[in-house]
């Protein structure tokens, strides 16, 4: 009895210690329990204390892209969106274990928060919307301060949470990074540990987070999805295809984000290979209606480019681009000489007179 009381007091003291505030950010407070995240961010400084070899840079870059696939192909397209199916639960568990090596929590945690983002995208309930909270919060501070947001609530996964092995893996997600660290140290000592785990992981974190932040700010919108998701070819390189983010928000339930042959999607190519090997058994594809709408919107954008400058075109919504082309077909002209505000006012007037039907948001 006395022992249990002491343990309870120790637990309470430990809880209070973890809640000690360290510093404030715009929408919350970073506390002591976030210290591992901060220290891990600082750990790449050890590159100055180990011998340098170019093979170490190759190791960091190689593990960045290998584990980026674990995030994009496993955590995102499988656990978050069920874009494909696998042969059995053992493969599913191994996939989850590989995903934990990315040091981004367990598969259930990751999928839960990502589904929450899609459900409330760009609203004040969206935990990492740059529209609502700005760049840095959407990029990295959201997951250390989200529990300070009174509007945040957990999104229950009723599909994958039924598997006890995945719940176990989610609770003990540190196993993956520990196994990776031990393997790296065993192969190449401290230099491999620093470059292969510390440097590579911090780069991987920020590469992953660009989709939350930059892909909702920079790029082109092919679809009207009710949010600010964009297609960004540069980010598609860094994230093995995830940069086609507006495509993804238009149709989430597939294995590919690059909808057309010219939109490189390394994640999809690798999943296709695993499909041929029999590991992946079924791959979801975007329906023809979505692809047809994308082609139509691209054609409208090309036509609109002849009417207004590139800068103006980038500030118009998908619906406004369609209205612009429609107005030009009806005889309206001289849009190129007008400013963005003037064009938007004209298009708003046209919308009131003759509303155009557009694709409903599928985000």
What are these regions (language model features)?
Residues 1-210, 214, 254-363:
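Non-catalytic, topology-defining segments of multipass membrane proteins
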């Amino acid at each position: 009895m006395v022992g249990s009381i002491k343990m309870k007091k120790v637990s309470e003291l430990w809880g209070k210690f973890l809640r000690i505030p360290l510093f404030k950010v715009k929408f919350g407070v970073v506390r002591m329990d976030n210290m591992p995240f901060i220290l891990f961010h600082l750990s790449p400084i050890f590159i100055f204390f180990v011998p340098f070899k170019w093979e170490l840079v190759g190791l960091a870059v190689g593990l960045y892209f290998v584990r980026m696939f674990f995030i994009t192909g496993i955590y995102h397209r499988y656990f978050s969106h069920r874009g494909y199916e696998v042969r059995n639960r053992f493969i599913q568990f191994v996939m989850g274990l590989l995903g934990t090596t990315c040091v981004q929590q367990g598969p259930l945690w990751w999928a839960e928060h990502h589904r929450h983002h899609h459900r409330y995208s760009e609203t004040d309930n969206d935990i990492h919307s740059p529209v609502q909270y700005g760049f840095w919060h959407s990029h990295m501070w959201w997951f250390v301060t989200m529990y300070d947001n009174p509007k945040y609530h957990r999104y229950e996964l009723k599909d994958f949470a039924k598997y006890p092995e995945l719940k176990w893996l989610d609770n003990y997600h540190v196993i993956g990074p520990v196994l990776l660290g031990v393997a790296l140290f065993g192969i190449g000592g401290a230099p491999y540990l620093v470059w292969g785990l510390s440097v590579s992981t911090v780069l991987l974190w920020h590469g992953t987070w660009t989709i939350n932040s930059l892909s909702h700010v920079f790029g082109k919108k092919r679809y009207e999805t009710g949010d600010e998701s964009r297609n960004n070819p540069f980010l598609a390189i860094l994230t093995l295809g995830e940069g086609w983010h507006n495509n993804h928000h238009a149709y989430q339930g597939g294995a590919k984000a690059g909808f057309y042959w010219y939109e490189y999607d390394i994640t999809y190519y690798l999943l296709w290979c695993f499909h041929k090997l029999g590991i992946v058994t079924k791959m979801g594809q975007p329906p023809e209606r979505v692809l047809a709408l994308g082609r139509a919107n691209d054609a409208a954008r090309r036509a609109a480019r002849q009417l207004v400058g590139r800068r103006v075109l980038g500030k118009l919504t998908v619906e406004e681009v369609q209205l612009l082309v429609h107005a030009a077909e009806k005889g309206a002209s001289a849009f190129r000489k007008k400013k963005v505000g003037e064009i938007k006012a004209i298009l708003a007037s046209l919308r009131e007179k003759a509303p155009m039907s557009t694709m409903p948001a599928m985000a």
